[in-house]
Amino acid sequence: MDVGLTVLDHRLLSEEPWPNGSLAVMELPLSADQRTVLRGRRRTACGRDVLLQLPRERALMPGDRLTDAHEQVHVLVTAALEELLRVEAATPLALLEAAYHLGNRHVALELHEDELLLLNDSVLETMLKGRGLKLTRCCRSFMPEGGAYIAHQHA
């Protein structure tokens, strides 16, 4: 391990105050995939390298608060911006059919009443266009549904 590399190994409950009355909090922007991996090197928004060594519990979520064993470093998890495809349909049934076909391919989806969001993928883009759906590329935070294996964690 690098000398001076901060190890983040504790989660704070959202209702707990920051330790030591801290006002200096670093942000840790993570993609949806990165939020499922609870161990490994990451870089904060201000460029500081940190090492996650969190217990294998649930995935990280935007708003989660992390600290080191000595409560000297305070980090707020945020959702990184990701290149996404926004899927819209002329009818609710067409959107439901798109979600069904993407689900059959185990594609991570963020579901909304009038749109689906998925990571940008040229093969899926071609398939969806072939179904007559309206696609727009966008850069947003991505909060996909947990799916059937939500309890499964990577480490």
Curated annotation (Swiss-Prot):
Alphabetical UniProt keywords: Chaperone, Cytoplasm, Nickel, Nickel insertion
TM regions (residue ranges): none
Keyword Flavoprotein appears in the UniProt entry: no
Broad class of the protein's primary localization: cytoplasm
GO cellular component, one term: cytoplasm
Subcellular location: Cytoplasm
Protein name per UniProt: Urease accessory protein UreE
Organism name: Synechococcus sp. (strain CC9311)
Gene that this sequence comes from: ureE
